[in-house]
């Protein structure tokens, strides 16, 4: 089940739907959850038997996502925002094949890499999820296939305006003990530059990160992770990762590091 939530998305809704409908694997459904668009985007929305539209008022993107989850019938859920795309037309086919070859005994998450349209680079995800990965940088939400039951058991918390998906991921790792498997492929093309990346919301994001990590991680664990971040010049690395000029170099080095770890 692919969930797309929207409110006055303009032409971006159909861009995302076209990317989904182009998939060579036909076994999917699309849940479009609209919060009351008035820009004509719903009237001009693509029509397909696999697209299901639900219109209901909501107070935030995370409340809209929770509403959408109640309508899914698939075993796994992927969230795509309007403007985000599948990286190529084979993503679902390759993911389905991987899931068949690597089944999970428990409800878990399959995740992959992400192409950043903003910096024109591929963002590599770690081949193994650890506590430090949870503290530092989890895989992009648009590149994670969640077992639907994980989203039903633990709805997104609307009190977090920026990081409710991050809080949910940490719940999956620390509380649900959900298995997580790396797909080894690029799942989504992430548009970036949206609501969460404004100057004001970056400050809110940092505050929410502090609250959420304290909720799931022990003080000793937090101290260790913060020390590592300080010693490895985290602000400089972040600036490089977000720079269109240096992002490719940084992500290339990251990919090589992850590759060596995977080989071990």
Please describe what each predicted stretch is.
Residues 55-72:
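Glycine-rich, basic loop-to-helix element that forms the pyrophosphate-binding segment
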Residues 1, 29, 167:
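Cell-envelope/extracellular polymer assembly enzymes that use nucleotide-activated donors
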């Amino acid at each position: 089940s692919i969930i797309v939530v929207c409110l006055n998305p303009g032409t971006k809704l159909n861009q995302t739907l076209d990317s989904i409908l182009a998939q060579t694997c036909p076994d999917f459904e699309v849940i479009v959850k609209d919060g009351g668009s008035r820009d004509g985007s719903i009237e001009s929305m693509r029509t397909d038997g696999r697209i299901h539209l639900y219109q209901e008022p909501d107070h935030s993107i995370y409340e809209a996502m929770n509403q959408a989850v109640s309508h899914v019938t698939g075993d796994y859920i992927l969230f795509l925002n309007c403007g985000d795309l599948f990286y190529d037309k084979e993503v679902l086919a390759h993911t389905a094949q991987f899931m068949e070859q690597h089944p999970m005994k428990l409800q878990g998450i399959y995740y992959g890499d992400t192409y950043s349209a903003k910096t024109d680079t591929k963002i590599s995800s770690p081949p193994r999820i650890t506590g430090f990965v949870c503290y530092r940088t989890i895989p992009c939400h648009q590149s994670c296939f969640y077992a639907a039951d994980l989203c039903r058991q633990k709805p997104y918390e609307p009190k977090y305006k920026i990081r409710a998906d991050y809080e949910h991921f940490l719940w999956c790792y620390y509380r649900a003990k959900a298995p997580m498997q790396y797909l080894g492929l690029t799942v989504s093309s992430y548009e970036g530059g949206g609501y969460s990346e404004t100057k004001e919301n970056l400050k809110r994001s940092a505050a929410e990160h502090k609250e959420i990590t304290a909720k799931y991680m022990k003080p000793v664990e937090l101290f260790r992770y913060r020390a590592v971040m300080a010693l490895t010049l985290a602000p400089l690395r972040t600036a490089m990762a977000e720079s269109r000029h240096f992002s490719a170099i940084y992500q290339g080095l990251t990919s090589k590091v992850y590759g060596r770890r995977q080989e071990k």
